[in-house]
A protein has these predicted regions:
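Active-site-adjacent "subsite" loops/lids of carbohydrate-active enzymes
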Residues: 5-42, 91-106, 115-176
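Short, low-complexity, polar/charged sequence segments that are solvent-exposed and flexible
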Residues: 43-46, 84-86
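Catalytic domains of carbohydrate-active enzymes, especially glycoside hydrolases
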Residues: 45-76, 176-181
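Conserved, mostly hydrophobic/aromatic
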Residues: 55, 65, 108, 166, ...
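Outer-envelope exported proteins of Gram-negative bacteria
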Residues: 64-68, 114-120, 181-185
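Glycine-rich, proline-tolerant flexible connector loops at the mouths of alpha/beta enzymes
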Residues: 68-91, 186-188
Length: 188
């Protein structure tokens, strides 16, 4: 239902899409979980143990994990639309056909925990911390952008083509991965 709702282009809430009742949640958010680690110093088993250490504690009662894998303009998986993220650990995994997005989704569901994909709508090249990624679509369509704080170039969602481009990127995610929901993070 989530894929159908996104493809329809209609604004719907998670409650509308999933037909659920409102409830209190205990959420663990993982903000760019792998990017901060030196991939040469651990293996996937270590990574999984590390990321689920908190959720695996029965006293905590986590019922959902929100995974933020990237800045939204680059892919941490093998994408047909987006360039691969410029973080070495992800580049290595993509090259080796290791889909960390699917692995962590499966690990989350195996624990009976809901998994949400958190997607930054405007990240990757506007954080103001140096070393920002080059985003090919922004380079080829400067007319789709406006200037944000510190001179960063931000998608202008008032432009139909920007909305369509982002919608197609989101559609790729929800068609390839069976997450329980999709968070659109407009804070960046």
């Amino acid at each position: 239902r989530l894929v159908k709702a996104i493809k329809s282009g209609k604004m719907v809430s998670g409650v509308d899409v999933l037909g659920a009742k409102a409830w209190m949640r205990l959420v663990e958010g993982n903000d760019r979980p792998v990017a901060r680690y030196d991939s040469s110093k651990f293996d996937l088993d270590y990574l999984i143990r590390h990321f689920f250490e908190f959720a695996d504690n029965n006293d905590v009662k986590i019922d959902s994990i929100w995974w933020n894998f990237s800045e939204g303009n680059q892919a941490t998986y093998r994408s047909k639309r987006l360039p691969s993220i410029d973080i070495p650990v992800f580049q290595r995994w993509i090259k080796d056909d290791i889909d960390i997005v699917q692995i962590l989704l499966d690990e989350t569901h195996q624990r009976g925990i809901e998994a949400f994909y958190s997607h930054r709508m405007n990240g990757g090249d506007n954080e103001g911390n140096g070393g920002q990624a080059i985003i090919p679509m922004k380079e080829s369509h400067p007319e789709w952008l406006f200037t944000g704080n510190g001179g960063s170039k931000i998608w202008n969602f008032a432009i139909k083509e920007v909305r369509q481009y982002i919608l197609e990127n989101l559609t790729e995610i929800v068609e390839n991965y069976d997450y329980d929901g999709l968070e659109l993070n407009f804070a960046r």
